[in-house]
Amino acid sequence: MASATQLTHRGIHLAGLYRSSWSKPLFRHLATKPILYSYWPSSCSWRVRVALAIKKIDYDIKPTSLLKTVSGHAYTDEYREVNPMQKVPSLKIDGHTLCDSVAIIHYLEETRPQPALLPQDPVKRAKIREIVELICSGIQPLQNVSVLDHIGKDQSLQWAQHWISRGFQGLEKVLSHSAGKFCVGDELSMADICLVPQVRNARRYKADLTPYPTIVRLNQELQELDVFKATHPSTQPDCPPEFAKK
């Protein structure tokens, strides 16, 4: 672990800050291990776990189920204080509680910019954000468990397949122009963090991926990276034994 004289935060030497009394609470917050409220199959939770892994941020997980029948579920007064929407993920870090996966990932990028998840080139940054929004605003919310529960069991699978396929049609076209080794060029980015969990959702709901060769290729490449393997839902502490990796 780095000593106080070695630690920096956004270019500020923390050792110098720590010597002033007003800054000691800030230093303590920065030195406190983050807590991630995560649910093992949640694609939103997986995004944040990957970002934390890429940034090499050590953290504790507090499993938070979205099933009311499981202990430690999100629908409690205690968790409502953490996340008023009672969804996952939430992250306690630097003395703050942050909710929503995309907001969390942006915070990590802005406070811990290396390794970078956004390039310096403004066009590439915009393209990455476009892909992130396409997935996180245009696809995943429409096949979220809370929506499918409202739709009803008889129609939920068809509903999920329809909206995933419709979203993937657009995503495939975007990626066919932007992709190199990864979603935008050859550098790992926020877009890749969002793609892999969404492909897992598509397979979970038995969507046909045959028409989307770029999506399939990128997913195969990305799944081989250690940051995705180590944070995979099947490796999580709250994953049921029948789904856990052997």
Swiss-Prot record:
Protein known as: Probable maleylacetoacetate isomerase 1
EC annotation from Swiss-Prot or TrEMBL: 5.2.1.2, 2.5.1.18
UniProt-listed GO biological process terms: glutathione metabolic process; L-phenylalanine catabolic process; tyrosine catabolic process
Subcellular location: Cytoplasm
One cellular component (GO) term of this entry: mitochondrial matrix
Cofactor(s), names only, from the UniProt record: glutathione
Start and end residues of each GST N-terminal domain: 32-116
Keyword Hydrolase included in the entry's annotation: no
Native organism taxonomy: Eukaryota, Metazoa, Ecdysozoa, Arthropoda, Hexapoda
Bilayer-crossing regions: none
Species per Swiss-Prot/TrEMBL record: Drosophila melanogaster
Molecular function via GO: glutathione transferase activity; maleylacetoacetate isomerase activity
Metabolic or biological pathway, per its Swiss-Prot or TrEMBL entry: Amino-acid degradation; L-phenylalanine degradation; acetoacetate and fumarate from L-phenylalanine: step 5/6
Top-rank lineage group of the source organism: Eukaryota
Family classification: Belongs to the GST superfamily. Zeta family.
Residues that, per the record, bind glutathione: 42-47, 88, 100-101, 140, 144-146
Cofactor binding note of this UniProt entry: Glutathione is required for the MAAI activity.
Keywords per UniProt: Cytoplasm, Isomerase, Phenylalanine catabolism, Transferase, Tyrosine catabolism
Catalytic activity: 4-maleylacetoacetate = 4-fumarylacetoacetate; RX + glutathione = an S-substituted glutathione + a halide anion + H(+)
PANTHER family: MALEYLACETOACETATE ISOMERASE
Annotated PROSITE patterns: GST_CTER (PS50405), GST_NTER (PS50404)
Job of this protein: Catalyzes the glutathione dependent oxygenation of dichloroacetic acid to glyoxylic acid in vitro. Possesses low glutathione thioltransferase activity toward 4-hydroxynonenal (4-HNE). Has no glutathione thioltransferase activity with adrenochrome, phenethyl isothiocyanate (PEITC), 5-hydroperoxyeicosatetraenoic acid ((5S)-HpETE), prostaglandin A2 (PGA2) or 2-hydroxyethyldisulfide (HED).
Main subcellular location of this protein, as a coarse class: cytoplasm
Residues of the GST C-terminal domain: 121-241
